[in-house]
Amino acid sequence: MMVNKEFEDYLLMRVHENDASRTKDAMAYSLMNGGKRVRPTLLFSVLEGYGMDARVGYPCACAIEMIHTYSLVHDDLPAMDNDDLRRGKPSCHKAYDEATAILAGDGLLTKAFEVALDSECSAEQKVALVKALSWYAGIDGMIYGQTLDL
């Protein structure tokens, strides 16, 4: 299954739950900035390979995409790579401002864990999912890679 409009709408809906704000707008701007959605596509393909409906993977795919996007928002900041463009469009800190970009990245990361917990799996599996996401996005995973990049 390729990522479709239904999944894109799901991503936006999860960002804008409860209310709208400048930070949520920056989160949505970054999340919907034209990525290829490779990670969700891989997850959906695996689910379909096991004969499952890809939609059961929406919460996990959304969480993974939010974590990936948070890393890009923070990577573009002046203190990191100081990139003005991301995928041919102004980086979040250029489209909004640096403080909003930091909050948007933080918001995407924390929202990812909330969304992941909406997965249709057992409590034990949810704990394993959150543990894996936090490790791979954490100091020994993605943050370690960013540290090497500085």
Where do the language-model regions lie?
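N-terminal amphipathic/basic leader segments beginning at the initiator methionine
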Residues: 1-15
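Mg2+-dependent prenyl diphosphate-binding active-site environment of isoprenoid biosynthetic enzymes
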Residues: 12, 16-150
